[in-house]
C-alpha cells in the first residue's frame, strides 16, 4: 500500500477546481434585473456580464419562487438574455481610518475625488450600526451651530436629530452650508443625496471650503445616480459618522436630503411591486426611515456624540406632506423655514413660532428657556395685530404686553436675521436674547 501511495504522490494529482455557482439573466424590467439558476441572498452583491464582456455590479433586492431580483448600482446598458450572473467575491465591508478626512466618496465607499485609494485600520459596515436604547448616552450639552436663531431659540444638543423643513428655494441648503462652516465639532460628515451635480461642487467649494473640508467626509450620490446608490449613500454617511462617534469624537452629520432618500426608497419598492399608499409612498418607506434616523444620536456610555441635521423638502410648501409628517414624528425637533420670511429678505427664514427643539430644556439654563418663551410670546402677540398696524387700526394702550411686543418687533427681527458669512457663537447669542427680553 505504501508503494501505491508513493506512486500517487509522485503523480502530483490536484483536486479539481470548485465550480463557481453561475446564474443567468432572464429579464430586464425597468430598474429590475431577473436572474435564475444561482442561489443568492437578499443584500448580496453580484456581477452581471454585459455584451462587450465587462461586468455590471448589482445587489439582490428580492426574490419570488426561483427568480431573484437584482438592482444595478449604475445604468444597466449592454445586457442580453442569458448573460451570466456571478456572486461577488469582494468584501462587503470597507476599511476606514483618519485618511478619510477631507475625502469624497460614493455610496460604495469608493473615492471620487481622484486623490488615490482609501484605507484604515478599522472595518466599516455598509449598514448603519444599531445601539441599544438603554445604553445610549443622554443629550446633556448644547451644540454650537453658529446660527443665532438656532443657538438662542432652538438650541440643539449634542446627539440630537433635527430636521430643516421647507419648500424649494427657501434656503435650506444655504443654511446647511452656514451650519457646516460654523458648527463646533471634531468631524463633519456630509451626505449630498439626490442633489444636482452643479450644487454638489458648489457646496464643497463654497460652503465647506478648503478649511472645512479638512475635518469633513463627503458622501455624494447626485440625482443622476440609481435609486439604489442614493439609498446606499445615505446609509454610508450614517455608518461613517457612527465610526468616528465610537472613536470618542463629536460628530455632526448633515444629510441633504431625507426626502430624496425616501423618494429613492419609493422607486425601489415600487419596482418590486409593493403597492403605493400615502401619496404614492409604499409602507416600507415609513418603516425604513426610523431605522435610519435611530442609528444617529449618542453612542454608549461616555463615548463621542453624533448630532444629525436632515433637510426635509415640503412639496408645495405643504407641512402635512407624508415625508415631512413622518420626519416630524421621529426626529428630536424641527426647524421650519417659510417662504413668507424668505420673500421679505429675512435670512435665515426660520419661523421660530412653528419650530421646536425637544431637547432644548435639558441642555440650557432655566433663564435661557424663560427668555426664549418670552420672545416666542412677543412674536405671537405681534402677529395678532400685524395686519392692523399699516391700516392705522391698532390703538396702543389697550394691552401693555401687546404694546411691548409691537415696540420690540424690529429688534426681534434684527436679532433673528444673520448674514451667510456671519458667525454667531452660542454664548453671545444667549446673552443677546436675555438682554432683549429682560
Predicted regions and their residues:
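P-loop NTPase nucleotide-binding/switch module
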Residues: 83-85, 92, 112-160, 173-178, ...
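Detector for glycine-centered tight turns/loop "hinges" at secondary-structure junctions
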Residues: 53, 109-116, 121, 318, ...
